[in-house]
């Protein structure tokens, strides 16, 4: 699948990935959803799946703040789903429909 990103979207995703890599152990970073399928509209968000080595509510809050600033700076709307490695390996998340779609259809950046 070919993903077509506008310049501001590509910059926003690069900014997000760079910011996360500086602060967290990012295991996977994928774009999925309408942007990948070529079904996005001008008002569509950019769906991103992030898998971290460690994930908790404090990290979730920090990442929300990072995304908020990036969305403002680049006039985008990045929407994320975040998974922790432990929850995937030891819990039911590996069978979650959203996780399966992200792994199957998502484009790794």
Predicted feature locations:
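Catalytic core of pol beta-like nucleotidyltransferases
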Residues: 1-27, 36-42, 52-109
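His-Asp-centered metal-binding catalytic motifs of divalent-metal-dependent phosphohydrolases/nucleases
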Residues: 30
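Short beta-strand->loop micro-motif that forms the acidic, two-metal-ion catalytic signature
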Residues: 46-50
């Amino acid at each position: 699948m070919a993903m077509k990103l506008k310049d501001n979207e590509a910059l926003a995703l690069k900014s997000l990935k760079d910011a996360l890599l500086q602060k967290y152990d990012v295991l996977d970073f994928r774009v999925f959803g309408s942007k990948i399928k070529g079904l996005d509209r001008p008002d569509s968000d950019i769906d991103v799946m992030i898998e971290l080595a460690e994930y908790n509510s404090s990290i979730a809050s920090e990442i929300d703040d990072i995304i908020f600033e990036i969305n403002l700076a680049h006039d985008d709307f990045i929407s994320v789903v975040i998974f922790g490695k432990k929850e995937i390996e030891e819990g039911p998340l590996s069978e979650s429909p959203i996780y399966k779609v992200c792994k199957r259809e998502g484009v790794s950046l």
